[in-house]
Curated annotation (Swiss-Prot):
One GO term of the biological process aspect: lignin catabolic process
Lineage: Eukaryota, Fungi, Dikarya, Basidiomycota, Agaricomycotina
Root EC class: oxidoreductase
Protein name, entry field: Laccase
Cofactor or coenzyme needed: Cu cation
Length: 499
């Protein structure tokens, strides 16, 4: 692991995680990038050095540290043209932010176009020396992080606008495509009798994965950096950008067991060891498992997740019992997604810079129709009714700068105002289920915060809005470094072929 102070050098390099070689965007030479780690209370100083040379995968970049509140450092959140101009090739930019009150499992990824699909993504863990769950596990280290990623043999800009599935699923950076079932699989080692805190991170650009380990139950203790009451399950459907910590008790016979991560579309199943990795007990032979998948009898259901420590839900316990309720009406026209009639097109001037330059109202902020101005210290409710008008469901939605209470989950018609889970990415479900996923949060963090579908191809198609929170206080609460102010003039001077 690297951090909390680290250089992250971004380059193009050939990589063959599934036996097929292609150019990718790598961090310090690898994809997924290295684990970034620190402790609660740390100041992270992450210097991103742009040495990219391949315009097909973009030469500019911008990195989002997913799940961090960035209170007072909205400029360090990362989304290109929301919070900053991209970093230009041959330049670097220091992301310098404090993590005073968050711990758990996070990740980082490019937040420029579809660049993270080409490899710029990796896990991020903030440890809590006083973790309330500490007595439940014996091991929690670099080797207990499990990343899931969809991998494509074609660069995102050269492939279809909306791919019909990945070529391979990578578990900890290794996997197999159906075309080559001899590629090496990841091996995760355990010692019989020990309890492991595994941190499952979806680095996905598109599919959700149903994750399971043959012969073992998984006890969930953390959801997107929020501690949860322990919940025992035998499979976890994890959507793009979500994270779960689960405890695995290595109490089975010494052997090899299949680890499975089945995508919801594309190359599904496990023939030839696709969508798989290996759980190997110490003392087991170095061979592939022969275990069989059993039917899941206790799959994760989001409504069964509850905060470890009682957390009040913003607003009052009734539908619309908030200071401001917003409905997000989805649409699609064959090439672009729309929310309430607007498809998000990145503005040439980042939204934060517009605010710092004096723009205050939704009418003044660009892109027109995509910026929602929220009052300070208010309870906000957002509903996302699933609709056949927005294909590619379920759409996982992510709000930057916050965790939110999921008062109505996908697959449920119940509103829970007493003990719903708080998280930062939520599945908005399917029209077939009649879903109307509803979230609540408090505006306690001034700045423009992106709210978008985390299927990166859908985001590229405009499936996003900006929540501009407490606009009058943004300038005073988010002083920007000179290096940030220099990003836009440098970027704007690039030739198109250097963007």
């Amino acid at each position: 692991a690297v951090g909390p102070v680290a250089d992250n050098t971004i380059t193009d390099a050939a990589t063959s995680p599934d036996g097929f070689s292609r150019q990718a965007v790598v961090v310090n030479g690898v994809t997924p990038g290295p684990l970034v780690a620190g402790n609660i209370g740390d100041r992270f100083q992450l210097n991103v050095i742009d040495n990219l040379t391949n315009h097909t995968m973009l030469k500019t970049t911008s990195v989002h540290w997913h799940g961090f509140f960035q209170q007072g450092t909205n400029w360090a959140d990362g989304p290109a043209f929301i919070n900053q101009c991209p970093i230009s090739p041959g330049h670097s930019f220091l992301y310098d932010f404090q993590v005073p009150n968050q711990a758990g499992t996070f990740w980082y990824h490019s937040h420029l176009s579809t660049q993270y699909c080409d490899g710029l993504r990796g896990p991020f863990v903030v440890y809590d020396p006083n973790d309330p769950h500490a007595s439940r596990y014996d091991v929690d280290n670099d080797d207990t992080v499990i990343t899931l990623a969809d991998w494509y043999h074609t660069a995102a800009k050269l492939g279809p606008r909306f791919p019909a599935g990945a070529d391979a699923t990578l578990i900890n950076g290794k996997g197999r495509a159906p075309s080559d079932t001899s590629a090496e699989l990841s091996v995760i080692k355990v010692t019989k009798g020990k309890r492991y805190r595994f941190r499952l991170v979806s680095l996905s650009c598109d599919p959700n994965f149903t994750f399971s380990i043959d012969g073992h139950n998984l006890t969930i203790i953390e959801v997107d950096s929020s501690n949860s009451q322990p919940l025992s399950v035998d499979s976890i459907q994890i959507f793009a950008a979500q994270r779960y910590s689960f405890v695995l008790n290595a109490n089975q016979a010494v052997d090899n067991y299949w680890i499975r991560a089945n995508p919801n579309f594309g190359n599904v199943g496990f023939n030839g060891g696709i969508n798989s990795a290996i759980l190997r007990y110490d003392g087991a032979p170095a061979v592939e498992p022969t275990t069989n998948q059993t039917t899941s009898v206790k799959p994760l259901n989001e409504v069964n997740l509850h905060p470890l420590v009682s957390t009040p839900v913003p607003g009052s316990p009734s539908s619309g019992g908030v200071d401001k309720a917003i409905n997000m009406a989805f649409n699609f026209n064959g090439s672009n997604f729309f929310i309430n009639g607007a498809s998000f097109v990145p503005p040439s001037v980042p939204v934060l810079l517009q605010i710092l330059s004096g723009a205050q109202t939704a009418q003044d902020l660009l892109p027109s129709g995509s910026v929602y101005v929220l009052p300070s210290n208010a309870s906000i409710e957002i509903s996302f009714p699933a609709t056949a008008a927005a294909p590619g469901a379920p759409h996982p939605f992510h709000l930057h700068g916050h965790t939110f209470a999921v008062v109505r989950s996908a697959g449920s018609t119940v509103y829970n105002y007493s003990n719903p889970i708080f998280r930062d990415v939520v599945s908005t479900g399917t029209p077939a289920a009649g879903d109307n996923v509803t979230i609540r949060f408090l505006t306690n963090n001034p700045g423009p915060w992106f709210l978008h579908c985390h299927i990166d191809f859908h985001l590229e198609g405009g499936f996003a809005v900006v929540q501009a929170e407490d606009v009058p206080d943004v300038k005073a609460t988010n002083p920007v470094p000179q290096a940030w102010s220099d990003l836009c003039p440098t970027y704007d001077a690039n030739a198109p072929s250097d963007q």
